């Protein structure tokens, strides 16, 4: 039986980064898919700590909050930098990913039609810090921090991939980010995951907007 279980809606949402991480690290996991109807009418929501998903099970450890789950996997699988300095930088980068993801989620679920144009216009300013971080680490030819992949890389990769769907060409003026996406997407296990039916057929968001 797989050691990990992801309990989540039938979308990529806040779980695709952890799926990328697990796939790339050669880990197996079980998916428990929760439909919107069962979430609203069933009892699961009342048992969830914050009344929300994802719920993540690692043996008898149950976690909520997607970034707490990523950090747990980072610690467990050696994906948290090589020392405390790198760990702090990984946290900083991941917090930046969360900031932009929150903006994205707000757009998708609350003001897509009227807000998309302004969002796309402002997007370069939100992407620039990640280009800067890459430029400060081995000329942008490695990872977001240090010389080994971290949980923040998987989170950033997912964020960039969904923005390329929202705004094709959004990375055209960011050569380091463009190369970074290509480089990480070419890692054999990530490449296999990204081309798998599970990923391809899984909607990005729950309302059909992307």
Curated annotation (Swiss-Prot):
An annotated GO BP: glutathione metabolic process
EC number: 2.5.1.18
Boundaries of every GST N-terminal domain copy: 2-81
Molecular-function GO term, any one: glutathione transferase activity
Keyword list, A-Z: Acetylation, Cytoplasm, Lipid metabolism, Mitochondrion, Nucleus, Phosphoprotein, Transferase
Reactions that this protein is recorded to catalyse: RX + glutathione = an S-substituted glutathione + a halide anion + H(+); prostaglandin J2 + glutathione = prostaglandin J2-S-(R)-glutathione; prostaglandin J2 + glutathione = prostaglandin J2-S-(S)-glutathione; prostaglandin A2 + glutathione = prostaglandin A2-S-(S)-glutathione
Catalytic class of the enzyme: transferase
SUPFAM superfamilies per the UniProt record, alphabetical: GST C-terminal domain-like, Thioredoxin-like
Localization terms from the record: Cytoplasm; Mitochondrion; Nucleus
N6-acetyllysine found at: 128
Entry-linked InterPro entries: Glutathione-S-Trfase_C-like, Glutathione-S-Trfase_C_sf, Glutathione_S-Trfase, Glutathione_S-Trfase_N, GST_C, GST_pi, GST_superfamily, Thioredoxin-like_sf
Residue numbers bearing the Phosphotyrosine modification: 4
Binding-site positions, glutathione: 8, 14, 39, 45, 52-53, 65-66
Any one GO cellular component localisation term in the record: cytosol
Record-annotated GST C-terminal domain positions: 83-204
N6-succinyllysine modifications at: 103, 116
Pfam family, one: GST_N
Subunit (UniProt): Homodimer. Interacts with CDK5.
Family: Belongs to the GST superfamily. Pi family.
Function: Conjugation of reduced glutathione to a wide number of exogenous and endogenous hydrophobic electrophiles. Involved in the formation of glutathione conjugates of both prostaglandin A2 (PGA2) and prostaglandin J2 (PGJ2). Participates in the formation of novel hepoxilin regioisomers. Negatively regulates CDK5 activity via p25/p35 translocation to prevent neurodegeneration.
Protein name: Glutathione S-transferase P
